[in-house]
């Protein structure tokens, strides 16, 4: 697997002014960092928790740093959702998902339109029989002691994707959702139904 970051720094979490920005203590200096994961992460974001950041690669970025991970009980959890598709593609190409050995990735960010509804899915897979498999990749960062749960926040976009996947399945497509559970102690998974208000 490729090296994702040249330089990784450790900082301490101090606050979250909005869904996409956190304040951190970096060696005594207060800094802002972009948080690419908009989930609630209530079980992860505690004052003083160690976060892993990298210098922002975009010169016009609003923050100097970008969050890539967080530590929980000595385990580093990847929060950089920009790389979720890379991880999924690595797992598929190296045949590390039992039952998916016949599939290979042919496109990323693939848009499908059906009955006037258009959705962009993370990966388009194919096999030697020419079948297509539309895959949505979700990064799961909500955990109990031994369980993984998803989602940790209401997402209309995510709901739309799942409903569209179901419609496409009814039209004959192979469809699926791959949950990247980043908690090695998880032995079970629960889909949460969140209140809409």
Question: For the regions a protein language model found, what residue spans apply to each?
Answer:
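Short nucleic-acid-contacting surface segments enriched for D/E, G, S/T with interspersed K/R
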Residues: 40-51
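OB-fold/S1-family single-stranded nucleic acid-binding modules
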Residues: 61-73
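Conserved catalytic cores of phosphodiester-cleaving nucleases, focusing on short active-site segments
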Residues: 11, 121-152, 165
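Short aromatic-glycine-enriched beta-strand elements
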Residues: 19-23
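Beta-strand/loop nucleic-acid-binding surfaces
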Residues: 31-42
């Amino acid at each position: 697997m490729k090296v994702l970051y040249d330089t990784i720094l450790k900082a301490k979490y101090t606050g979250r002014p909005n869904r996409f920005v956190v304040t951190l203590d970096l060696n005594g200096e207060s800094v802002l960092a972009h948080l690419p994961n908009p989930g609630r992460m209530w079980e992860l974001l505690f004052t003083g928790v160690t976060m892993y950041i990298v210098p922002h690669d975009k010169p016009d970025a609003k923050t100097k740093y970008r969050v890539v991970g967080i530590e929980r009980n000595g385990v580093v959890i990847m929060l950089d959702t920009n790389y979720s598709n890379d991880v999924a593609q690595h797992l598929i190409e190296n045949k590390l998902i039992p039952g998916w050995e016949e599939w290979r990735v042919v496109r990323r960010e693939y848009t499908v339109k059906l009955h006037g509804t258009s959705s962009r899915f993370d990966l388009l897979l194919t096999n030697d029989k020419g079948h297509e498999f539309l895959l949505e990749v979700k990064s799961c960062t909500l955990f109990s002691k031994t369980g993984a749960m998803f989602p940790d926040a209401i997402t209309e976009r995510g709901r739309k994707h799942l409903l569209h996947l179901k419609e496409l399945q009814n039209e004959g497509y192979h469809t699926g959702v791959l949950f990247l559970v980043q908690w090695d102690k998880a032995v079970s998974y629960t889909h949460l139904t969140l209140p809409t208000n």
